Each structure stands twice: as C-alpha cells, then as structure tokens.
Amino acid sequence: MASQDYDVVIKDGLIFDGTGSPRRRGDVAISDGKIVAMGRIDASSATSVIDASGMHIAPGFVDLHTHYDAQVFWDPYCTLSGWHGITSVAIGNCGFGFAPVAEDMREYAMKSMTRVEAIPYESMKQGMPWDWVTFSEYLDSLDRTPKAINILPYVPAGPMLTEVLGLADAKAGRMPTNDEHARLAQMLNESMDAGGCGWSAQRLPPTGPAAVQRDWDGTPMPTDMMND
C-alpha cells in the first residue's frame, strides 16, 4: 500500500489472531477502525504508530457472565473487565436485571441486586437514569449512554415473571395461566426483537444442594421457583 494508507500500525507485538494459529511476532495495521493487514509493515505507512514491544496483540475478549446492567451507566469501561482486554460483555445473566421494571418495582430491583451481586445501593440509586420501563426502553437508554465496551444484553426472566405474575406469585412458583403465558412469550419476543441476545434464568431451588443465593429478604429468587 502507498504511504500513509494506514491510520494506525501496532509494531512488534506478539500476535494471537484468534484462529488457533501459533503466536507470532509482527505488526497490525488498522484503517477506518478495522484490521486491514498483519505481518511486517513499514511504520512510515501509518499516521500513528504504537510500539507493542514486549506486549501481546489479540482480538478483544468476550466476558459472557457479568452483571454490569447498572454499572455501565456510570462506568463506561465496565471495570474491571475493561482493564483486561475485554471489549464485549454480556449482561442480564442469571435471570437478574432491571427491565422490564415498573416504577414501583425499582426499589425492589436495586435491593435485590445489592444482595445477590453486591452492587452498592447508593451507586445504583444515583447512577442509573431509570428512564425506562420496558426492555426495549432499557436498551434505548443504553444506546444513549457513552460506552467504551460492547454490550450483549440477555433478557432476564426474573423481571418478566415479576411483571406478569406479581412478585409474591412469582416467588411462590405459581403456574402462569394461558393468558399470562402468552403475555410472557410476547414480552420475550418483543425484547429479543429489540436487541436481546438471548434470555437467562437462575435455577437454584431452595430445597436443592445449590440453594445458596437468596433475594434481599432471604426468600428465593423468582426464577428459582418458576415452573419448567
């Protein structure tokens, strides 16, 4: 390529290209935000040069199990993940999350996440804009939030069960009626159409050997009690 055809050249790093090929020392050229060449590249062909001597060059890692659902609103790097080469995180794991959450259930949602994921209550209260009710509106709020990391949002089953059955009935494990089942299915379909990458649930029945994670008041989480 002609001179100055690259925006950035990362020089002399140990390249792990993500294909399973052996690591190799070399350079990586980037143009328009995309990798366009690897190998030995003339540094004069780039607008900017990064010396990666003694460092590794690798694709961004994906953290499939996180609970940055709230933290992303005040921490664009989703630390600590963003400090360790992770460029994409999945949120909404374990059936926990903040959408759909009606206004009168916000307090419960924050208390619950304080208990099960040790997210400071005051951080959530002050850091989240709470400008949503539905999952689609939550994703819109995420889109408006400056971020330095990609977000893969699971649709958490807990808030859907709470929304449709009510908190007490969801925790009691009541079987949804046909109409409620249809509403749950519609809610999930709409959430997936809005951008959900999947759905999640925690299954730790209170009588089972793994019954270690309870809600803020000591009762089971809604998805622990849901019917198959």
Placement of each model-derived feature along the sequence:
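Histidine-rich, glycine-flanked metal-binding segment
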Residues: 2-8, 14-60
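Divalent metal-coordination and catalytic microenvironments
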Residues: 13, 28, 33, 54, ...
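Active-site beta-loop-alpha junctions enriched in small/polar residues
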Residues: 67, 156-158, 204
